[in-house]
């Protein structure tokens, strides 16, 4: 009987799904507001993941506090992946968000969603999912450009982008994403400290 109650408690309820939907939408808006401007300019597009990490940290941590169960983090990433796919972004971005959110959910689960430090680390992994498209570019630039031309991306945009990129940009993108995500998560943990204490989440 106890094990049945435990399983039932771990399952997502309708209320949980509504909460996840609302917070996922807010995370999407945060990512769009802080990362979107970078994607608009070809010379800055590789810094999209860095900008995208800036605002969503507090919302991400609050989502975990509200629904400390397996699934919400992946659902948030799944919605991002669906949006990326539907809007014609490179498939690497879709795969990145799917993989990043799955790993982020698994990481938070290892501490049963009750460790602020692990949850912040989980957020960093989630944000690194946004580098998927750009990692695909560095693995095979010609195939990446060819694919984006097929999807209708202006050649002028791609020419400017490729002329501005090098391995230093790639490393800066990765390091910047980790740093900004860490900063966003840290600020979020301070802003929401009382809420976390109430939810039983510790350092």
Regions found by a protein language model. Give the residues of each.
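Hydrophobic alpha-helical transmembrane segments
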Residues: 17-22, 50-51, 73-78, 94-95, ...
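Interfacial aromatic-anchored transmembrane helix boundaries in multi-pass membrane proteins
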Residues: 35-44, 80-108
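Membrane-embedded alpha-helical hairpins and interfacial helices in multi-pass inner-membrane proteins
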Residues: 45, 120-193
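Aromatic-anchored segments of alpha-helical transmembrane domains
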Residues: 24-32, 79-87, 125-135
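Hydrophobic transmembrane alpha-helices
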Residues: 2-71, 75
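Short helix-perturbing small/polar motifs within transmembrane alpha-helices
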Residues: 29, 97-134, 185
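Short, charged juxtamembrane terminal tails flanking transmembrane helices
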Residues: 2-6, 193-203
